[in-house]
Amino acid sequence: MIEYRTVDSPIGLLTLAGRDPVLTNLRMVDQTYEPSRTGWTENPRAFAGAVEQLGAYFAGELTEFDIELDLRGSEFQRRVWRALQTIPYGETRSYGEIAEQIGAPGAARAVGLANGHNPIAIVVPCHRVIGASGKLTGYGGGLDRKQTLLALERRHSPASLTLFD
């Protein structure tokens, strides 16, 4: 049985879903693609650990999630999503760089499609992928949220801290 929980965050309402504690879905409530909730059961106490980690992330206190995930997609999509998880907090990569990383040079557009189908936003950091020119491009939650997440990470990134911070 799939359980879900909706929580508030600095970027709006987030819905977490899966078989607690294993997360299969994390989306912004008003995101462009919303999965069917047929057969889902609301449980306001589910995913307590994930919610706690998200709170720490938004407070700038957590740079790496430790949440059990069940990523379902094609083999190519899962390769892309695993590559996204290697992008360090506070950094970005281009679609082309991800394509190279997974051994599919020239597949930047396919990487973009896989990135757009990422079922677990924020934890699988699809917001860290940008265009080759450095421009912010597509994000299911909206470019304003993508910019907010990247700014949050830059502000709290270990690389941005100095000895006197």
Curated annotation (Swiss-Prot):
The keyword S-adenosyl-L-methionine does not apply. GO terms for molecular function: methylated-DNA-[protein]-cysteine S-methyltransferase activity. It is found in: Cytoplasm. It catalyses: a 6-O-methyl-2'-deoxyguanosine in DNA + L-cysteinyl-[protein] = S-methyl-L-cysteinyl-[protein] + a 2'-deoxyguanosine in DNA; a 4-O-methyl-thymidine in DNA + L-cysteinyl-[protein] = a thymidine in DNA + S-methyl-L-cysteinyl-[protein]. InterPro entries: MethylDNA_cys_MeTrfase_AS, MethylDNA_cys_MeTrfase_DNA-bd, MethylDNA_cys_MeTrfase_DNAb, MethylG_MeTrfase_N, MGMT, MGMT_N_sf, WH-like_DNA-bd_sf. It comes from the Bacteria. It is an enzyme of class 2 (transferase). Disulfide bonds: none annotated. GO terms for biological process: DNA alkylation repair; methylation. Its EC number is 2.1.1.63. The active site is at residue 126. Keywords: Cytoplasm, DNA damage, DNA repair, Methyltransferase, Transferase. Its main location: cytoplasm. One of its GO terms (cellular component) is cytoplasm. Involved in the cellular defense against the biological effects of O6-methylguanine (O6-MeG) and O4-methylthymine (O4-MeT) in DNA. Repairs the methylated nucleobase in DNA by stoichiometrically transferring the methyl group to a cysteine residue in the enzyme. This is a suicide reaction: the enzyme is irreversibly inactivated. This enzyme catalyzes only one turnover and therefore is not strictly catalytic. According to one definition, an enzyme is a biocatalyst that acts repeatedly and over many reaction cycles. NCBIfam families: ogt. HAMAP family: OGT. Belongs to the MGMT family. This is Methylated-DNA--protein-cysteine methyltransferase. The gene is ogt.
